[in-house]
Amino acid sequence: MFTLRRKKQDIKLSKIPAHIGIIMDGNGRWAKKRMKPRVFGHKAGMDALQDVTIAASELGVKILTVYAFSTENWARPQEEVKFIMNLPVEFFDKYVPKLHKNNVRILVIGDKEELPAATLDALERARELTKHNSGLILNFALNYGGRAEIVDAVKLIAQDVLDARFNPGDITEGLIADYLMTSNLPYLYRDPDLIIRTSGELRLSNFLPWQAAYSELYFTDTLWPDFDKKALYLAIEEFNHRHRRFGGV
């Protein structure tokens, strides 16, 4: 049982989701409210990510998958995209050492072919540095699109059928899951138990559509840079009140 003190009553958590997905939304609006450029919000968002990752690790969460950059985000202003692509470099220098000290392991899913070399290098260094850590997995969805992930999986499966590796009748949900990008995660925890979206938007925006089939969804008006340990506890508290039926009664 984890307890966080608050003025009116304690937040008590008895059921901790093994895998949490977060759509980190609202950096630009957070900056605008402070009359700052959008990139100011992205920097503040990295502080929030570090704090939430450590808080989740302390709770015993096994995987935290964060939607860092979607395949649709390339349509944003070029200067903003350039800044976002440089964030992994800054993240490695400023935040990864502390996360490494907290036994966090870093992984990445998404289409890496379009990412700049410096971005890829920073991500690979973070992955390599933390690969032997046994704590929480911080899984970045970077240049990720859920529908494209499924299309790519179908193409690979079709090719393997043509190569006579298995028959169409052998295709199951489990086999398809093995062809998705999240196959790099521990088998029992590939699908998020809880998906959190900040900033008040009420949609998944192409985030893990296959894996989210039975995820509990939690939407909050809190902008991502303001999402902290208490906000995480409140989301998990709501998760504790849910009854997950998985299609049953």
Curated annotation (Swiss-Prot):
Keyword Nucleus carried by entry: no
Cofactor details (free text): Binds 2 magnesium ions per subunit.
Record-listed Mg(2+) binding positions: D25, E216
Gene3D superfamilies according to UniProt: Decaprenyl diphosphate synthase-like
Record carries keyword Metal-binding: yes
Any Pfam family: Prenyltransf
Protein residues bound to substrate: 26-30, 38, 42, 70-72, 74, 76, 197, 203-205
Highest taxon in the source lineage: Bacteria
Cofactor requirement: Mg(2+)
Enzyme class per UniProt: transferase
One GO MF term attached to the UniProt entry: manganese ion binding
Active-site residue numbers: D25, N73 (proton acceptor)
Protein keywords: Magnesium, Metal-binding, Transferase
InterPro entries in the record: UPP_synth-like (IPR001441), UPP_synth-like_CS (IPR018520), UPP_synth-like_sf (IPR036424)
A single GO BP: polyprenol biosynthetic process
EC number: 2.5.1.-
GO CC, alphabetical: cytosol
Main function: Catalyzes the condensation of isopentenyl diphosphate (IPP) with allylic pyrophosphates generating different type of terpenoids.
Subunit architecture: Homodimer.
Record-stated family: Belongs to the UPP synthase family.
Protein name: Isoprenyl transferase
Organism: Streptococcus mutans serotype c (strain ATCC 700610 / UA159)
UniProt gene name: uppS
